[in-house]
């Protein structure tokens, strides 16, 4: 089918999100990867009356690359330490194209997004937002007080996406991955979405 400009219009079918059972999907590797030309620089400075902690977007000298094999613990579904996790995803012809895993933190009444993956072949089509919206719906239905996730200061695209989806920065950890995360420009950022609270 041609549009008015003469270009071929391709209508792709809408992919459905389904729950991924622990029995079938436990241990499934999520090939999370990203490239980034920018990072959020974090610096902690002690002052006379407290601390000064500027966070500013800066450009990498060379493109930062995060590959699935990086790190001691690659991303997998239903890790043993997430005892009450649930996973949802998009599967086509037996291939996992996208997934989100959530797990309640019962003692604090918070819901954690423990994994979020969207394959390159379907990025930019709104499926990341749909997975996030599903987690938001579960947060509201179960009356959790906040929906939380972890990302990295090196993954500016992810940070900006979460901000656009109504999340806000609620904390960070400067030694989560190594003892020199600040110097490596890969600081863990904790972000949260609060039900019934408008984003500024």
Language model: regions and residue ranges:
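Short alpha-helical
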Residues: 22-25, 108, 156-157
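Acetyl-CoA-dependent GNAT
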Residues: 29-114, 119-121, 132-134, 138, ...
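Conserved glycine-rich acetyl-CoA-binding loop
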Residues: 93-95, 119-133, 137, 141-142, ...
